[in-house]
Amino acid sequence: MNQIEIQELTTHLSQALDQNYDVVNMDAVLCVICALEGTTITKEQLEATRLAKYINQLRRRTKNEHLARRAKSLLKKWREMVGIQQTATENLAHPSQISSSQPALDLVKSPITSFITEPIAPSQQIVSDLHSNIDSAEPPLSGEHTLLHPNFSNLVNSIKDSDRHENIAITTLHTHKDRRHSHSIRSCHVASPQPIVIDHSVNSVINLTDDSTVKINEASVVIDIASDSDENDNNGSLNPKKLNSIVPAPLPIPSTPSSRQRKLKKEKRSKEREGQVATNTRFGAKASDGFQQAALTTDSEIFSLSNSSMSSIVSGDATSSYSQNKSRLNSNELTFTGRFKAVDHLFRSTESGKHKIDEYSAYDSNASCSRLSPSTVDEVKKAEHLFDAQLTNTTANQIPMSAVSIGYESNTRHEYLESDSPSQIPKRRGRKKGSKGVDALIAKESSSLSQQIFFGGSTVKKVKTTKELFNEIQSRKLSVSMQSSASNLSNSSTNRDLPSHTTFPRQTSSCSDTSMNSPHILETLSGSAIFASKIDDLGNTDSDTVTSDPSHDSNKSQEIKECTSLDSNSNSIQSLPLANNRENLIPTNVNDITTQLMHLIHSLNSPLSEIEIERVYQEKIIPCTCIVIEGVQGTLGESNNSTLDEQSYNAKISLNSKDNLSCHNQDNYSTSQRSVNGEVIDTQPKLVKSIFDLDFDDNDDPLYFIMDEIQKPIARADELKNNKSDTKNINFGASAQNASLNIIHFNDDAQQDNSNQERGKNETQNAIPAFTVHEDPDCLARQRFYIQTNKVTSFHINALHNYYIPNINGNWDSVESFTSFQSEHTIMDTMESYTVTNGADVVPKYGLLTSDRIRKDLSSLKSIKPYRVKNFTSLISPFLGVAKCLPTCRRARRRFKNFVNSSTANDKISNNFESLENMKTSFKNCNPLNVKIDGTTSAIYSHNENHVPMQVNTNVEQLPPSQSFSSNAISYNLLKLADDKVCHDGISDKSSNTGCQGNSPYSSSSSSSYSGRKEDQHIITKNLQNKNIQLNSRKSDMKRRKRIYLENDSKKKKHYRKRIKTAVNRTFSNLHRNLYSIDSENGMKNDYKNEYGNSNNEEYAIVQRPAGDGENCSNHIVLTIKKTPSKINSPANSMTAFSPPSTSDGANLQKSILDLRLEDTNISQSITEIPQKKDLSKTDRIVHQSRSSAYRRIFRKPDKSQTKFIDLDLKHLFHLKANSPCISANAKLHNKLFFPHELSRDNTSGIRERLINYSSSSSSSYDDDSEVENTSFLKKANVNKFSASNNRNLKTETETCAATAISEFKFESDEDSILTSLGDSDIDIQDEIQVINDKVDYCNDFQNNKMLESFNSIFVDSLRTNTKNASDNMGSSAHITSLESLKPENADAITRYCNNNNLGVNLSNELSNISAKPLKSFDSTMKLPSLGIEHCTGIKTSSDMASTNIAEKKLTRIQQFKEWHQVLQLRSYNNEPLIVLPYVLLE
């Protein structure tokens, strides 16, 4: 019970008692005690309610022995529950007990004795009595029986008693009960057997006194705890003959049940005593009824032993006694189930239909199981009436046990009713010695038995949760059913098969341990046939709980079910189709559980589908019964009021007629209308507002007051005017009737005045439709609305977010309309057709109705998934989102300023650039997010800073500002992240190679590396650290690449400084290389951090707007994600970008991406043949260093054994820079999507700007990461080249290439000059550099500049191999030459880059490396595999690049892109571009 119920019981009890605790209302007291006996109670509840005090006082004050006994049993139970074990034992040997034992002897004499094939002891013939009832059997025929077989004889006796008490104190020899049983019908007063006290430890049934060592071979005693009391009652009425007939087969008694039996016996004895006394009183008065209730509750309690009853029965005592009993009785001999049933009770079950309706049924285990709700008084009374009927019938019907026990057993209410039992059975409040409160546990009284079993038996102080109960029930069902199934099947099953009820004991209520309390379980456990039979009764007697099986339901139980709903909590399912036979039940116990579970599962409804939900919803749609009344205010308030009143009245009538709407609103409305009196507008009743009505209430709406305030002054003015100019007043105003005229303001003031006045009147009087909603309080639609709106469940949310709803939540009209990446063209088309300019394009603004498609899946805006991607192991967690811009840009700008502050830097920058101001301007233009960085160096650093912002001054030790910076290059560097590290690590070499290559983007990277030399070194150090970290994690090949890279880094560091110095000394092309190297180093760094095989460095490219946009064009911060061309050709590879007007290549670049793709396709075809390294002859050396670098990169690519990276940006985002045609000759496939000339263009200041850093040139230049040394060398060369390019006219001497003079050239002429300037030595150097670059690129390809392998890199293994070989042949002088040649070309490219505000990625360098000649030679040497459409973008031919000759133009650039990440450039809210990348690695 819960606290409230306990409190109520306490209240009732207190009311039933007077101040002296004398019983005032015996019925109420008995009801309360029955309820308490049938329920569990917690210590806290007792403490809170002080219920124990009332019970104790009642026990002390009452003169009713039965009531006192029951109260005492309750207190015992509670003590045990509370943990206060009372060692005091009841004096079981009372004359009454002796007398009851005598009836037990009579029982033994009765055929029951015959029923017991073997007496447990010589005197164990009492077992036959057990069949009648344990209580009946309990009184041994002789004292020796009680002594010899205290368990069994006592069990029998106690069964009788228990029948009365529902609690079988089997543990104690109910000799006194036997004596009491002597009072029972068959009670033959044998010499009162000595009361045998059976320890609780010993199973009461099996506990035989030391005298009874013989096991009962007689028919196994099935002890049905639940039913024995009733059965005892019933059996008491029954003749021993029945017991004999019923018992024929020994019932298997599991040893564990025996312990329960003991406890039950004890409880039965004590409760029987109490019950007998109570029944004696009951027979004379309601006390008997109360006792019957108690007895009834006893059965129910036994089943309601949810917590302790069965557990107590099965407690250690039970188990220990079980072992003892086991020695005494075979498990087959004793069977405990639910309640102890005598075997005869099995037969009686048929009779039980007649009599089992008695009190016992009222006390069904189920009924008592729901201890929380003990059987109601009516139920108890009903049970009592049933019991009385049974008493009348029991004498004939019940087993001899009843005859034996009725005289004694309180359980045998029949005896009490007969009133011989009370006389025969002395009141015994004390426990027998050794009873250990088992009496309390198994008090025969239904309440005391169940409660004691619940509380005392197991001494369970804790109320078990439903889950615990269910688990225990199942486990017990399994164990008990499995254990007892064999024995029960063998013995008891046959006996119980007789009664269909017993076959399937009903499960007890959930309150009780179903397994233990369930009739079948108890029956299975019960060792006495009586118990078994009682189980049948239990089934019958169980209240209408689901647990009770109809098969078991006896008539009594069925009748009681009406009264007792307590068992409704029972876990068992009555409907389970179990055979009536206990055999069926036992073998199907496991199956029963499964069946029950299946029933439960099937009872659960499967979730409704959307269609079903919709259907249900449609079915549930209810028309709104609310009424909207349009109250048209008449011209006069009165008329309005009357109209409104009529309307409201009519509405009321209609509503009332419908009985749907309450009219009080209308009444109020009408009343308010009546009160309005022409002021209806102001005083109109408050309309019922719709939840959608956001307007003020009429009374609260300030509009009326505002209107009044406005109108009053107007009216006053009108009056004044009217007074002043009455002559001017016109009829128009006078016509108050004409609202329109009133409204119209005439030029005449008087007319206006009149109109205003009349207007105010008319406003109050004019018929303004007023819609009044009369809500029907019973409107189902409204209720549903409130319910649904107030109860938004996950279903609604999921429906909104996950379900496809056309035109809702951005869902497109059809699911099929969802666009995914379908083809190159479709990508560009979708990009163009569907533009994401701001968040509203993805997420509609609040309150904005968006009928257009809103992409919920922007995957189409992303590049194709790379075919092969290395496991991404990043030291830094990838940041998905907009590339970081401002902090980096600011840092870069500060660094640039710092660098620019140095006069040398300024001079160099001025030398390298037309003007530092131009650089700064372009750089500022290049600043992402319009972040103004005052120097290209800062941009370069920022380019390096993409991963780690780098200060040019810090990073660039000696790089001349011109070398280290171009505004575009700076801007490129500003956002280039991945490339920076690579630039430092691998790109420096690459850039040096590029420097040799001249136009190769390495030159820019080298310049970047120069600019970031210190930082490059720092980054390199970080990169090395990162690489070291990643080397550990990388595969052996990656480790090898790392080692190469580390070596390259170490070399790079050295060479970087040297090259940077040289670059500072004047190699602007080296600036490009430095840029590339920085980028590549950053990329390398990122590669180490981000381990994607071929992914090149991600870089934020500041995309300069086309020259047409002007210097002022805000830079686009683009994180260029490169994929190896082998990976995926994405239409983004060739992006519609403005080809820099500076070169014809730029025009080509201007082609749309599709054009570029076509062009690439054509290029792939034309490029099919690419001059190999052999082409990289001195002739090729003559080719610009960029060419040789490109070639070398190609060569390195084979070394790297990975596709080269192609820097990709959205074509439309990038203005391709045109590289000098020199690239065509030596050109190896450009690692980048665009050639330098494509990326560069002349800015407004005339400086060639890099339109975009669509790729981390460093990574592309590094595409071969094979050699970090090469990278470092390239970086030096790039530094030189970058410095040369910065200086344009200055010769760049790298320490490596110091001997070689690099031709001076201007940015504009860099590529051309490189083409012309490159000498054989340059070519050799380029080859060498290219080899280095190839190695670097190899590393980069694996490391991929921390970018995804899929990042673009041109892959021509054969070309790269040949190139690498040629580059290997090429000496440092060749590198120098390449650097020289690259310088001009790189300078141009860098200039373009800087002008483009790109991150100083000298694509032109690399592109220039792919000079037309080298390309031509490559073309002749090798054919690029013709690329399919997927690779069309991968191949680009820049005839402009190969301007030197037509062949070179054809071969000018071969770019093979197999995959790329499409970079989405969004226009930021300030109209500045934001680049959204699939992966943006931020440090």
Swiss-Prot record:
Gene Ontology molecular function, alphabetical: transcription coregulator activity
Record-linked Pfam families: Med26
Gene3D superfamilies: Conserved domain common to transcription factors TFIIS, elongin A, CRSP70
Modified-residue entries (Phosphoserine), positions: S204, S258, S421, S551, S1177
Composition skew (Polar residues), residue ranges: 496-518, 565-575, 989-999, 1020-1033
Compartments where found: Nucleus
SMART domains: TFS2N
Function field: Component of the Mediator complex, a coactivator involved in the regulated transcription of nearly all RNA polymerase II-dependent genes. Mediator functions as a bridge to convey information from gene-specific regulatory proteins to the basal RNA polymerase II transcription machinery. Mediator is recruited to promoters by direct interactions with regulatory proteins and serves as a scaffold for the assembly of a functional preinitiation complex with RNA polymerase II and the general transcription factors. Required for activated transcription of the MtnA gene.
The protein's name: Mediator of RNA polymerase II transcription subunit 26
UniProt organism field: Drosophila melanogaster (Fruit fly)
Lineage start: Eukaryota, Metazoa, Ecdysozoa, Arthropoda, Hexapoda
